[in-house]
Swiss-Prot record:
<feature type="transmembrane region" description="Helical">
    <location>
        <begin position="264"/>
        <end position="284"/>
    </location>
</feature>
<dbReference type="InterPro" id="IPR029071">
    <property type="entry name" value="Ubiquitin-like_domsf"/>
</dbReference>
<comment type="subunit">
    <text>Interacts with PSEN1 and PSEN2. Interacts with UBXN6. Interacts with UBQLN1, UBQLN2 and UBQLN4. Component of the HRD1 complex, which comprises at least SYNV1/HRD1, FAM8A1, HERPUD1/HERP, OS9, SEL1L and UBE2J1. FAM8A1 binding to SYNV1 may promote recruitment of HERPUD1 to the HRD1 complex.</text>
</comment>
<dbReference type="InterPro" id="IPR039751">
    <property type="entry name" value="HERPUD1/2"/>
</dbReference>
<dbReference type="GO" id="GO:0005789">
    <property type="term" value="C:endoplasmic reticulum membrane"/>
</dbReference>
<feature type="domain" description="Ubiquitin-like">
    <location>
        <begin position="10"/>
        <end position="72"/>
    </location>
</feature>
<keyword id="KW-0007">Acetylation</keyword>
<feature type="transmembrane region" description="Helical">
    <location>
        <begin position="290"/>
        <end position="310"/>
    </location>
</feature>
<feature type="topological domain" description="Cytoplasmic">
    <location>
        <begin position="1"/>
        <end position="263"/>
    </location>
</feature>
<protein>
    <recommendedName>
        <fullName>Homocysteine-responsive endoplasmic reticulum-resident ubiquitin-like domain member 1 protein</fullName>
    </recommendedName>
</protein>
<dbReference type="GO" id="GO:0032469">
    <property type="term" value="P:endoplasmic reticulum calcium ion homeostasis"/>
</dbReference>
<keyword id="KW-1133">Transmembrane helix</keyword>
<keyword id="KW-0472">Membrane</keyword>
<keyword id="KW-0256">Endoplasmic reticulum</keyword>
<dbReference type="GO" id="GO:0006511">
    <property type="term" value="P:ubiquitin-dependent protein catabolic process"/>
</dbReference>
<dbReference type="Pfam" id="PF00240">
    <property type="entry name" value="ubiquitin"/>
</dbReference>
<feature type="topological domain" description="Lumenal">
    <location>
        <begin position="285"/>
        <end position="289"/>
    </location>
</feature>
Amino acid sequence: MESETEPEPVTLLVKSPNQRHRDLELSGDRGWSVGHLKAHLSRVYPERPRPEDQRLIYSGKLLLDHQCLRDLLPKQEKRHVLHLVCNVKSPSKMPEINAKVAESTEEPAGSNRGQYPEDSSSDGLRQREVLRNLSSPGWENISRPEAAQQAFQGLGPGFSGYTPYGWLQLSWFQQIYARQYYMQYLAATAASGAFVPPPSAQEIPVVSAPAPAPIHNQFPAENQPANQNAAPQVVVNPGANQNLRMNAQGGPIVEEDDEINRDWLDWTYSAATFSVFLSILYFYSSLSRFLMVMGATVVMYLHHVGWFPFRPRPVQNFPNDGPPPDIVNQDPNNNLQEGTDPETEDPNHVPPDRGVLDGEQTGPSFMSTAWLVFKTFFASLLPEGPPAIAN
């Protein structure tokens, strides 16, 4: 019985989370309860915290008042580190506490660490308790910026004042990150050309030829007849590239001569496609249908390549083929009095070409529509041949 009542001394090192005070080392008994230890700390701790306001943490666990130190502290260690979290009595004493902390910074920061090397693992817990201490009822009377500033000033000399627990710094960092992300997104979209508006009107770039200098007063205005019905002259640039076509993405595309200069691979592909078509038609149809389709296909192919035209193509007059037509408004010698237009004298005299054109503009007939459907169907089965080149 005497061995059970014999006191078991133990050394306790009580640390404050915000480093307002030095680490307090005291001697106790393993038979003490946590409530007895809190009552002892209320007498020896500098701020004299009440037992109900104290929170003791050991190895990351919150100690309850009814627990015994014998069950919590291992016997292999002689010094045990406890973290004390308590409320502040009055905010008016904060300047005095800050002055004491400033005096303690003059001493080397590593003195306590060299004395107790096993306490290095508790530094992270010390920082985590800062935020918990800010939420206590003692800080409710202080505004948020002042509370954050006082908490940062209360950190030890080994810690920076710009900790990641400040809500002001967190909001500022979030704004900077959002701005940088937005600028990177704008730069990426501008580099990819997503914001480039499409051209309103697709125009073909025309190579402008140097125009000769105009002669001053070459045709006086009094010698020119007043022709109000003259059509505007269309200026055709002979130096422009005639092989340009419009591009769906914007800008011109130069026609290439791939359709004319075909290699053996293109001809082999066309022959293989046509042979597959013939085999399907031959094996899944009769001989008469096969001959009919073959004949129509040959006729359509000859018409498509230009060997078997149904009507002559109109000859296109290019600007380089002959001199430009005479302009009525530019007749300085009044040669218009030599004769009048035969069409104006005889309204019954109509050229035969005009009658043909008027007949074509009336509308397609049923036969022409049926022929167009037949031609389009069989032309889609054949590969596209080289275009006819006008002489």
